[in-house]
């Protein structure tokens, strides 16, 4: 069994349901410390994080490539629906089954073994290697990567490149990498009316009727046209509720929850202003609270994307598609202190599902891609 596969199995065997790390990080830290990494645990409100760095011969003047990822996994769902226990690594039909196999313990193992092989082959490497690992990516993500980024920023730590081990591949290893993600902004809208008997509408104000024209306009609005890297910004309603449940009462207010997934073609301030303008145009009496869970980030083609493309082609024969689709990731936090952030990992078809798995044949090439990028950028 390869070192990468063995470590993947060891990590899967630890039931690290978010935010419980179950000592996965300690296992990684022990391996990294043996290579000469300086390892620092950064805990926050029950979340375990660590930052590890091994300086190259150029010290802080050299480039720093960081691997970023998460040890936490989503809950298993009904255990009886799994073909084998989710935290017992199990091989069937050329696949390794277990919660976190694809998202993202194979990537974590690949990071560690790639670093081990690279340091053994290049003991005098010029650039530096970092690890930024959290147990709060699958949860609220309020005490994880963002806290490490804040700590690094406060001390002036600079990252030049970062690979996030998210499972970006689709049909096969290496067909897709993510060089950016859309931003996410939500709104909680309360439209105020006047409650009353449904038989006497002239004595009440129905907030649903008042909201409906504005809602139709918001749904039809084209917020932007996107750009070379991003599709157009989308606005979607996630929840609409009003009333007491009675059939003879006009509700006193209507509550609407909505979300923007927005590109670098729009700004938070611009989108908010346009929503308020539409609501105001319709004369609504309303309250609106905003929350921004992530800003969009984009890494244009450059040193990191070129190195990753070459490494993937060498291992798989594929030239990966650059994509910004999907939800948010911790890359949105890392982009604050790193100009080049790209996500790459195994196929994602089974993530978060019953019987999550990774094809065993992808484990070594995944590690090799990470090692090749190290060799190209910091050797």
Curated annotation (Swiss-Prot):
Top-level lineage group: Bacteria
E.C. code: 3.5.1.18
Listed GO MF terms: acetylornithine deacetylase activity; cobalt ion binding; succinyl-diaminopimelate desuccinylase activity; zinc ion binding
Keywords assigned by UniProt, alphabetized: Amino-acid biosynthesis, Cobalt, Diaminopimelate biosynthesis, Hydrolase, Lysine biosynthesis, Metal-binding, Zinc
Protein name in UniProt: Succinyl-diaminopimelate desuccinylase
Pfam annotation, one family: M20_dimer
Associated pathway: Amino-acid biosynthesis; L-lysine biosynthesis via DAP pathway; LL-2,6-diaminopimelate from (S)-tetrahydrodipicolinate (succinylase route): step 3/3
Annotated binding of Zn(2+) 1, by residue: 70, 103, 166
Cofactor (UniProt): Zn(2+); Co(2+)
Active site: 72, 137 (proton acceptor)
Protein family according to the UniProt entry: Belongs to the peptidase M20A family. DapE subfamily.
Function: Catalyzes the hydrolysis of N-succinyl-L,L-diaminopimelic acid (SDAP), forming succinate and LL-2,6-diaminopimelate (DAP), an intermediate involved in the bacterial biosynthesis of lysine and meso-diaminopimelic acid, an essential component of bacterial cell walls.
Disulfide cross-links: none
Gene3D superfamilies: Zn peptidases (3.40.630.10)
Binding site for Zn(2+) 2: 103, 138, 352
GO BP field: diaminopimelate biosynthetic process; L-arginine biosynthetic process; lysine biosynthetic process via diaminopimelate
Cited InterPro entries: ArgE/DapE_CS, Bact_exopeptidase_dim_dom, DapE_proteobac, Peptidase_M20, Peptidase_M20_dimer, Peptidase_M20A
Cofactor: how bound: Binds 2 Zn(2+) or Co(2+) ions per subunit.
Subunit structure: Homodimer.
Gene responsible for this protein: dapE
PANTHER family for the chain: ACETYLORNITHINE DEACETYLASE, N-ACETYL-L-CITRULLINE DEACETYLASE
Enzyme class, UniProt record, top EC level: hydrolase
């Amino acid at each position: 069994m390869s070192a990468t596969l063995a470590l993947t199995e060891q990590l899967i065997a630890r039931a690290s349901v978010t935010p419980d790390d179950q000592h996965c990080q300690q296992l990684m830290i022990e391996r990294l410390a043996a290579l000469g990494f300086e390892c620092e645990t950064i805990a926050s409100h029950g979340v375990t994080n660590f930052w590890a760095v091994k300086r190259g011969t150029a010290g802080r003047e050299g480039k720093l490539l960081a691997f970023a990822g998460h040890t936490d996994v989503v809950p298993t769902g009904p255990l009886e629906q799994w073909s084998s226990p989710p935290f017992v690594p199990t091989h069937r039909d050329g696949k390794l089954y277990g919660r976190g196999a694809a998202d993202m313990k194979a990537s974590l193992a690949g990071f560690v073994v790639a670093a081990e092989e690279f340091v053994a082959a290049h003991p005098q490497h010029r650039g530096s290697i970092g690890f930024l690992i959290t147990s709060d990516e699958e949860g609220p993500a309020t005490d994880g990567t963002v806290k490490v980024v804040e700590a690094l920023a406060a001390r002036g730590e600079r990252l030049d490149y970062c690979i996030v081990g998210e499972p970006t591949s689709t049909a096969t290893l290496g067909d897709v990498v993510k060089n950016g993600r859309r931003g996410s902004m939500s709104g909680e809208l309360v439209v105020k009316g006047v409650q009353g008997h449904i038989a006497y509408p002239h004595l009440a104000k129905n907030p649903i009727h008042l909201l409906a024209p504005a809602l139709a306009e918001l749904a039809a609005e084209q917020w932007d046209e996107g750009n070379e890297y991003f599709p157009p910004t989308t606005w979607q309603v996630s929840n609409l509720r009003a009333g007491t449940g009675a059939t003879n009462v006009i509700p006193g207010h209507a509550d609407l929850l909505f979300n923007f997934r927005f590109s670098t073609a729009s700004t938070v301030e611009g989108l908010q202003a346009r929503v308020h303008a539409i609501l105001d145009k319709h004369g609504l009496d309303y309250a609106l609270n905003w929350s921004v869970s992530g800003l969009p980030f984009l890494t244009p083609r450059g040193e990191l994307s070129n190195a990753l493309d070459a490494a993937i082609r060498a291992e798989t024969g594929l030239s990966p598609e650059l994509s910004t689709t999907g939800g948010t990731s911790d890359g949105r936090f890392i982009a604050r202190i790193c100009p080049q952030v790209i996500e790459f990992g195994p196929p994602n078809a089974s993530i978060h599902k019953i019987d999550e798995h990774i094809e065993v044949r992808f484990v070594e090439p995944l590690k090799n891609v990470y090692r090749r990028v190290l060799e190209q950028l910091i050797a």
